[in-house]
């Protein structure tokens, strides 16, 4: 069990049978009245966030989240298949479960998959990936205002913003947490 007074950023806990992670917290001790812990937390299953004040003595079960490094194998159109790098066991996931991550994953790329009670609920691609530009407008010479970007489609189908000098066929480094262009490779 974990008490609300032990909340720190990144701590996982269960409430009403759902797993949550603490995003932000603040211990508040007003001049008058009882102390409380103002907490912003995220539901690990559906991604929803909430803010709530808890009594510091409130107790919650600790959510045990298992993390596995898995390799993205292929998609059959409906399901996305990942293989455990240790046991070689395959796990099929639906589009809803991989929605944000799949736009940055190529076949045979590794991803971190989080499990709650043996059921996968979150897929995290590597923080940085290198993908090839498959479609973009050519940069116009003389269009040199600072920080001008254009849209580009990468080989996985994701659409990102890149500087004007990036052309079709170039390989770029992307931060998957923000979806931003980092550099040309």
UniProtKB/Swiss-Prot annotation:
Keyword Transcription recorded: no
Principal location: cytoplasm
Key word Protein biosynthesis present: yes
Matches recorded under CDD domains: S1_EF-P_repeat_1, S1_EF-P_repeat_2
Pfam families noted in UniProt: EFP, EFP_N, Elong-fact-P_C
This protein's UniProt keywords: Cytoplasm, Elongation factor, Protein biosynthesis
Coiled-coil features, chain-numbered ranges: none
SMART domains documented for this protein: EFP, Elong-fact-P_C
GO cellular component, one term: cytoplasm
Localization in the cell: Cytoplasm
GO molecular function: translation elongation factor activity
UniProt pathway: Protein biosynthesis; polypeptide chain elongation
One GO process term, biological-process aspect: peptide biosynthetic process
Matches recorded under InterPro entries: Elong-fact-P_C, NA-bd_OB-fold, Rib_uL2_dom2, Transl_elong_fac_P/YeiP, Transl_elong_KOW-like, Transl_elong_P/YeiP_cen, Transl_elong_P/YeiP_CS, Transl_elongation_fac_P
PANTHER family, A to Z: ELONGATION FACTOR P, ELONGATION FACTOR P (EF-P) FAMILY PROTEIN
Family classification: Belongs to the elongation factor P family.
Function in brief: Involved in peptide bond synthesis. Stimulates efficient translation and peptide-bond synthesis on native or reconstituted 70S ribosomes in vitro. Probably functions indirectly by altering the affinity of the ribosome for aminoacyl-tRNA, thus increasing their reactivity as acceptors for peptidyl transferase.
Name of the protein this chain belongs to: Elongation factor P
Native source species: Alkaliphilus oremlandii (strain OhILAs)
